[in-house]
Swiss-Prot record:
This is Ribonuclease T. The gene is rnt. Binds two Mg(2+) per subunit. The active form of the enzyme binds two Mg(2+) ions in its active site. The first Mg(2+) forms only one salt bridge with the protein. The active site is at H181. Its EC number is 3.1.13.-. It is an enzyme of class 3 (hydrolase). Homodimer. The lineage of its organism: Bacteria, Pseudomonadati, Pseudomonadota, Gammaproteobacteria, Alteromonadales. It comes from Shewanella putrefaciens (strain CN-32 / ATCC BAA-453). One of its GO terms (cellular component) is cytosol. Trims short 3' overhangs of a variety of RNA species, leaving a one or two nucleotide 3' overhang. Responsible for the end-turnover of tRNA: specifically removes the terminal AMP residue from uncharged tRNA (tRNA-C-C-A). Also appears to be involved in tRNA biosynthesis.
Length: 224
């Protein structure tokens, strides 16, 4: 089968977009004024059967940018002490340079043309990521400037629940509420949930589309 029509390749699954699962922990809800404190990024891969799975995860504690607002209620909620030296925090720029390098390498390996953020309530994470990139004056961001895959929406459709913990449990994905609100933990659970939904849709016959399958069959007949 020609690579052009192989629906089991990641580059054909999302119109050439490479999905990158992201979760952030912050010191508030305003991406312009409130600090980004933690970020985790999970890269995905697709096997020869077209099943999506986790590849690897990057994780960074972030130093608040100069003049950043730190909302006490937000810090109490996520349990982060921005001044704790044991966090091993790095600057936003250092973190995003490493993230850019890793995601661009994975995107290229998958032969995709751009990355797209996957997140639970994705507008929030996308907003903080975009603003941090802007603050750092980083050029050539690998991420689409506005399109995202929101697992809250996808889970509502596919599973019937929009809360991450509930959706994971309903999908058979273990979820420990004591570990929640850690970017590392939440990102990997979000990645598992996204993979579950994508793979389940395939198993139910939703992918590849009949038109695409017909094109593949026609090409196979021509080659024979």
């Amino acid at each position: 089968m020609s690579d052009i029509c192989d629906a089991n390749k990641l580059k054909h699954r999302f119109r050439g977009y490479f999905p990158v699962v992201i979760d952030v922990e912050t010191a508030g809800f305003n991406s312009q004024t409130d600090a980004l404190l933690e970020i985790a990024v999970t890269l995905l891969k697709m096997d020869d059967e077209g099943m999506l799975g986790i590849d690897k995860t990057l994780h960074f504690h972030i130093e608040p940018f100069e003049g950043a607002n730190l909302e006490p209620a937000a810090l109490a909620f996520n349990g982060i002490d921005p001044n704790n030296p044991l966090r091993g925090a790095v600057s936003e720029k250092e973190a995003f340079l490493d993230i850019f390098k890793a995601v661009k390498k994975a995107q290229k390996a998958a032969d995709c043309h751009r990355c797209i953020i996957v997140a639970h309530n994705a507008a929030f994470d996308h907003g903080f990521v975009s603003k941090a990139i802007e603050r750092c004056d980083l050029k050539r961001s690998p991420f689409h400037p506005f399109a995202t895959f929101d697992t809250a929406t996808l889970a509502g459709l596919a599973i019937g629940h929009t809360v991450l913990a509930k959706a994971c449990m309903m999908a058979g994905i273990p979820f420990d509420n004591k570990e929640a609100h850690s970017a590392l933990y939440d990102t990997e659970r979000t990645a598992e949930l996204f993979c579950y939904i994508v793979n389940r849709w395939k198993q139910l016959g939703g992918w590849p589309l009949l038109a695409a399958a017909g094109a593949q069959d026609a090409e196979s007949d021509t080659e024979e």
